[in-house]
Amino acid sequence: MGKYVLGVDLGTSAVKVSALDHSGQIVAQESFDYDLIQKQPGYNEQNPEDWVSGTTVAIVRLILNDHLDASNIEGLSYSGQMHGLVLLDENKKVLRPAILWNDTRSTPQREEIEAKLGDEFVHITRNQPLEGFTLTKLLWVKQNEPDIWAKAKYFVLPKDYVRYRMTGNLAMDYSDATGTVLLDVAKGEWSQKICAALDIPMSMCPPLIKSIDLAGTVTPAYAEFSGLTTDTKVFGGAADNAAGAVGAGILHPNMVLSSIGTSGVVLKYEDNADVNYHGVLQFEDHAIPDKFYSMGVTLAAGYSFTWFKKTFAPAEDFTDVVASAAKSTVGANGLLYTPYIVGERAPYADADIRGSFTGVDGTHQRYDFVRAVLEGIIFSFRDLFDIYEENGGDFDTVVSIGGGAKSPLWLQIQADIFNRKVVSLTNEQGPGMGAAMIAATGLGWFDSLQDCAETFVHFGKAYEPNPDNVKKYEKMHAIYKQVYQQTKTISEQLLDYRRAEL
């Protein structure tokens, strides 16, 4: 019987725990769902105990149902949903439900941070103080729940709380710490200036560790609870985007990730902390020690296609609808789609912009609209590539995951619009794979995450850009880039109309 590592993927709706062997093969996998607490619009919370019990149930199932010998589980690590605020008292007991990344109640606190710190905040953290980040949530509790705040002695993020319950040690890894927007990225330490300006005790900030650092071993109490042994080593882990980048092999400067889920992410490996995108793109510590990544988010990437299919092709198969785009031409016969149907994050931080089809002609067929949606999502990603190129970014390979990697046609569209080689993964497992790789590297199975990727990460067919298509898409993207400014005022007026009618 071989030795294993566990990758714990702590998501927003479920936890998935994967057991992998030395060759990177998944030998067993279990998951457990948990609930979201939505007390009113804009509020999204979870009970941290649900994460602990869900993770434990998944581990118990691996041991009992999948017959995994606990003595052969050498180590484990985590991928965690980012930004969620977990407040603990002096005895490290949870004080209130966790406020999650998708909670938007803290707009007044964001405005306060901007007023007090201005551009200096972005200079220190490399990020804007968005409602999704942890700091605004801390301030919201401070200002709206003074009794809770008076008892609060520590804050951690979701995976950190699960790790604490397993090991008895409080810590936060750098990749998650940058997402709190309390970290001085250049110095690699909690920002005294930000804490002082906002009257947040530095003592609340947990110790910082690297993703591959040993955070402890399983306690006797948790061993009895879960079936793991007290010899099981527990490593720091990473934020879900960092772990996802590791699992996709984004471990070299020449590589960029193109991820199409409900939202879309373009993520680039960064070598040093000197790169500054002035808050237009998020800038975070990577799971690789002393390395970083930048990322931009398209809010409605896969959701654009889901909306289109639900509205115009509800009874048809996803694959067939995507394939129909091949009947159209490069550039969708002169039809453009902007995927701003729920607002946009990057490069335009604009909650009121809305999507559009531009250039609709009486000769257009449904397949032209399908292709326009596929292309429009990638044009939005191309906007982010332009930012990289303007800042001297040099990369030649794009790793595509999610919905965009499931269609050869869509992979070729990406290669042509990006004008770069695009590859998919043959063993796409998302952040859970990255978490397992962190544990494997921490244990010394491999010298580095890059070495681990040589064994654990496998790429599929490479799609090379077609020079003729590249030229056509360059013309279409130049037109696409004009649509935002041309429709911004119209979108605001239409949104005002809709709100007045509600």
UniProtKB/Swiss-Prot annotation:
Site positions per UniProt: Important for activity: D9
Active site: D240
Spans through the membrane: none
EC number: 2.7.1.17
UniProt catalytic activity: D-xylulose + ATP = D-xylulose 5-phosphate + ADP + H(+)
Pfam families in alphabetical order: FGGY_C, FGGY_N
Gene3D superfamilies: 3.30.420.40
Inducers of expression: By D-xylose.
Enzyme class: transferase
One of the record's GO molecular function terms: D-xylulokinase activity
Disulfide bond residue pairs: none
Biological processes per GO annotation: D-xylose metabolic process; xylulose catabolic process
Keyword ATP-binding listed: yes
Binding annotation for substrate: M82, H83
Record keywords: ATP-binding, Carbohydrate metabolism, Kinase, Nucleotide-binding, Transferase, Xylose metabolism
Origin superkingdom: Bacteria
InterPro entries from the UniProt entry: ATPase_NBD (IPR043129), Carb_kinase_FGGY (IPR000577), Carb_kinase_FGGY_CS (IPR018483), FGGY_C (IPR018485), FGGY_Carb_Kinase (IPR050406), FGGY_N (IPR018484), Xylulokinase (IPR006000)
Homology family: Belongs to the FGGY kinase family.
HAMAP family: XylB
Purpose of the protein: Catalyzes the phosphorylation of D-xylulose to D-xylulose 5-phosphate.
Protein name, entry field: Xylulose kinase
The organism of origin for this protein: Levilactobacillus brevis (Lactobacillus brevis)
Lineage of producing organism: Bacteria, Bacillati, Bacillota, Bacilli, Lactobacillales
